[in-house]
């Protein structure tokens, strides 16, 4: 499929309010990133990659919708290592948002807690998700977007 046609086909939302085409849900992290790739309401692939691989893939594939777990700095008692991890994760989220802005994609941030709602739902059992915790989190954020969010 030509690149322009593929981009046109992967619109962020259908008229029903549900995503159409290919879109991604992401669990960001300093070292490990979980990525779930959806085709409409069907989970396609789910895997783990590095932050650098994620940014390269976002630019290469330019998904028109990206659902990503948000991150906030809550504790003033973090160790130096935890603070570095927090900063790197925030930079990664900003990088994804900047890339999407450059090509016209839409980014939706979700609170980390919503993944638990998705994982307790009856729809979670229908998904074939690898045991990796980052990948499971990414898939849960996608499922939450599909079944519970107000888009």
Question: What do these predicted regions represent?
Answer:
Residues 1-151:
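Phosphate- and other anionic-substrate recognition elements at nucleic-acid/protein interfaces
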């Amino acid at each position: 499929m030509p690149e322009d046609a593929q981009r046109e086909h992967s619109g962020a939302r259908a008229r029903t309010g549900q995503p159409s085409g290919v879109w991604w849900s992401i669990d960001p992290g300093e070292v490990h990133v979980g990525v779930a790739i959806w085709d409409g309401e069907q989970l396609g692939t789910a895997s783990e990659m590095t932050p650098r691989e994620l940014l390269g893939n976002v630019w290469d594939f330019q998904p028109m919708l990206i659902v990503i777990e948000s991150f906030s700095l809550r504790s003033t008692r973090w160790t130096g290592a935890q603070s570095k991890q927090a900063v790197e994760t925030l930079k990664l989220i900003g990088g994804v948002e900047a890339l999407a802005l450059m090509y016209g994609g839409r980014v939706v941030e979700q609170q980390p807690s919503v993944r638990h709602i998705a994982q307790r739902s009856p729809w979670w059992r229908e998904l074939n998700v690898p045991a990796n915790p980052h990948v499971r989190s990414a898939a849960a954020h996608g499922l939450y977007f599909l079944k519970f969010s107000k888009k």
